[in-house]
């Protein structure tokens, strides 16, 4: 038989005790075997530099290195609050380095053979704006030795422009129209269909969700960012739909004008 212990840290010592039992129920001698997991040999000469720029809902993490010929990079990206970062990779540079060094084939860890850099960058799509993110990168040289991990934490900020508040003339003149099309019971949920018609020259974002999902938004600006992050950009004429709705849900809408100024959101009770 074979005994496997996965997810162990480098340099972990283990002792295996085993005993055999025959058909008559008689025990044999206790067998003892000690072993330890290997400790990676790092190339301390490799240095990595990371920097980040942002597009709309996209973060581009620029990767560069020197000190050795590099054949590939291994990297992890995600939100600092995610369980992948806090629980699996341990939430620190040191713990992430330890994990990545022995689990480079884990689905959480990407490499540039499978996901090449784009113009020298790791491209993070659909990032949550105004939330802290982390990128951890390790390089592998031609001899198969890894560099030390380099970590970059960053918060991609959504530019709200000159925020326009409820009741202002510009707010009133650009407020989108929301039309409820149906609310059909489906088991324990409701299928809710609605349509948003933005004013000319504006782009709207919408979501249908329970008010509890918006708890923690203390200001109109925070609510606008939450809708932008978790909702969808409105395509004029398209019917929006949620499959697991509740009659207590609200439809939230925020919008921005051609100058990039966001507007205080509105909400509508499901009809």
Task: Tell me the role of every PLM-derived stretch.
Residues 42-50, 161-166, 171-179:
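Proline-enriched interdomain boundary motifs that mark the N-terminal boundary
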Residues 4-13, 110-117, 123-132, 231-248:
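Surface-exposed, short loops/turns at beta-strand junctions within beta-sandwich domains
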Residues 87-115, 217-233:
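Solvent-exposed serine/threonine-rich low-complexity stretches and specific carbohydrate-binding patches
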Residues 15-21, 134-140, 250-256:
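Extracellular recognition modules
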Residues 23-42, 142-164, 259-271:
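Extracellular fibronectin type III
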């Amino acid at each position: 038989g074979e005994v496997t212990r996965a997810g162990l840290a480098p340099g972990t010592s283990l002792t295996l005790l085993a005993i055999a039992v025959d058909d008559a129920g008689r025990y044999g001698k206790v067998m003892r075997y000690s072993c330890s997991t290997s400790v990676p040999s790092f190339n301390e000469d490799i240095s990595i530099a990371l920097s980040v720029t942002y597009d709309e809902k996209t973060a581009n993490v620029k990767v560069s290195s020197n000190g050795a010929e590099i054949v590939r990079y291994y990297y992890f990206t995600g939100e600092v609050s995610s369980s992948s970062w806090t629980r699996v990779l341990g939430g620190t540079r040191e713990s992430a380095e330890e994990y990545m060094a022995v689990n480079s084939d884990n689905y959480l860890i990407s490499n540039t053979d499978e996901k090449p850099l784009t113009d020298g960058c790791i491209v993070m799509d659909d990032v949550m704006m105004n939330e802290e993110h982390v990128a951890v990168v390790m390089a592998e040289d031609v001899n198969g030795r890894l560099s030390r991990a380099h970590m970059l934490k960053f918060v991609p900020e959504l530019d709200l422009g000159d925020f326009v508040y409820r009741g202002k003339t510009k707010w009133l003149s650009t407020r989108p129209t929301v039309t409820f099309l149906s609310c059909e019971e489906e088991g324990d949920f409701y299928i809710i269909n609605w349509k948003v018609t933005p004013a000319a020259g504006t782009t709207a974002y919408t979501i249908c969700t329970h008010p509890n999902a918006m708890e923690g938004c203390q200001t109109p600006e925070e609510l606008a960012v939450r809708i932008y992050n978790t909702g969808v950009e409105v395509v004029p004429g398209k019917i929006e739909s949620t499959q697991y709705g509740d009659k207590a849900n609200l439809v939230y809408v925020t919008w921005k004008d051609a100058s990039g100024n966001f507007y205080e959101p509105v909400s509508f009770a499901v009809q």
